[in-house]
C-alpha cells in the first residue's frame, strides 16, 4: 500500500479515470454493435455520424489510438456504403 499522501491521491484519480474510460469505451462499443446490426441505410448513416464522433472523442482523449479510431471509422463507413438504399 502507498505511504505518501500524493500516491494515495494518484490511486484514487487513476481509478476514477479508469472507470470513466471504461464507461466511454463500453458505450462506443454498444453503438458500433447497433450500427453493424442495422439494415436500413438511413438509420445506419445517422448512427455512423454519432459513432464517428464518439471514436474521434476517444482518440482525442487518448483512450484509443488515433489510427485505431481511423481504422474503425473506415471499416464502418465501408459497411454503411455497402448497405442497400
From Swiss-Prot:
The keyword Signal does not apply. InterPro entries: Ribosomal_bS20 (IPR002583), Ribosomal_bS20_sf (IPR036510). Signal peptide: none annotated. GO terms for cellular component: cytosol; small ribosomal subunit. Keywords: Ribonucleoprotein, Ribosomal protein, RNA-binding, rRNA-binding. Pfam families: Ribosomal_S20p. Coiled coil: none annotated. One of its GO terms (biological process) is translation. The keyword Ribonucleoprotein applies. It comes from the Bacteria. GO terms for molecular function: small ribosomal subunit rRNA binding; structural constituent of ribosome. HAMAP family: Ribosomal_bS20 (MF_00500). Binds directly to 16S ribosomal RNA. Belongs to the bacterial ribosomal protein bS20 family. PANTHER family: 30S RIBOSOMAL PROTEIN S20 (PTHR33398), SMALL RIBOSOMAL SUBUNIT PROTEIN BS20C (PTHR33398:SF1). This is Small ribosomal subunit protein bS20. It comes from Cytophaga hutchinsonii (strain ATCC 33406 / DSM 1761 / CIP 103989 / NBRC 15051 / NCIMB 9469 / D465). The gene is rpsT.
